[in-house]
Amino acid sequence: MHLPDGSVAHAIPQGPLAIFPGSFDPLHDGHRTLAAVVAWKFGRPVHFELSRTNVEKPELSDEVVNTRIEQFRGFAPIWVTQAAIFEAKSALFPGALFVVGFDTALRLLDAKYYADGAHRDASLQAIRERGCRFVVGGRIDSSSVFRTWENPGELFEVLTEADFRFDLSSTELRAKLC
């Protein structure tokens, strides 16, 4: 784990954590605000997680990883893992509350990311058995409608629009920077 002061720790802190996975390309105010809301609402420190591997993207180079880690200096701890899927993340961080956006939560349930529906169900059961849950931040869709889950189920906590709303995605921020 890379700490805000730039040092590195190798042990997972004691007590319940909130883990905020993402690519953080770039880390922006929406990430910071969502982390603050989760820390306040759930009473858990928020650590960020950057996986070198991703089911939809090429593996991150050392240079890219180091650049993304640097964004967290003076802000928050960040873990660098090889855990591309949440079942693997739950093995690394048992008991964690994973902080995800609406689109990531939908992908978590999408059968196309699993061999079949039974594998998806087994993966979600493994996450549940490790005591992990998800907190989901909603988002504004292309019609300017705030989207979040109405019936989240036992694995998910949903933040309302009053809890958290940030209207600019990382993709939109990257497009504005180019």
What are these regions (language model features)?
Residues 1-178:
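Nucleotidyltransferase catalytic core that binds NTPs
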